Amino acid sequence: MPGFIPGIHVFFCAPPEMPRWELHPQLARDTVNIGDLPLARVLVINDANWPWLLLVPRRFDVSEIIDLDEVEQAQLWTEIARAGRALKELTACDKLNIAALGNVVPQLHVHVIARRQGDAAWPKPVWGAVPPVSHDRYEVDRFIAALRKKMWLVG
């Protein structure tokens, strides 16, 4: 038998399956999925107080930006900039708040929030400032359609 070496046994095993990426359950509950960029899933937070996006890299078991390799880090910043530009163009906001906190939800996610001087929390952070307000279905659908167009989202 060609290639056979007496006394040596070789067993071929299938490579281990990579764990499937899944969105953290709390993020799934609190958001609407609007599409995917090359690295990150783009979500809208279910709170009409602010135009508020989340970008969640579709990578398993990543909790910090530094857990991504350098190419993915650069890609994430490119996608954050794309989200920020879209929000700024659509809302004419005064300031973008961009943050990756992860104190409550360990899965890496980046908040991109459009702020206006005089909004309900200005100039403080939005978290816990006022109770969340549900989106008007028609308004959020229009906003999502505009975001998809501006960001060239696949979804």
Report the location of each language-model feature.
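A cross-taxon signal for low-complexity, glycine/charged-rich
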Residues: 6-7
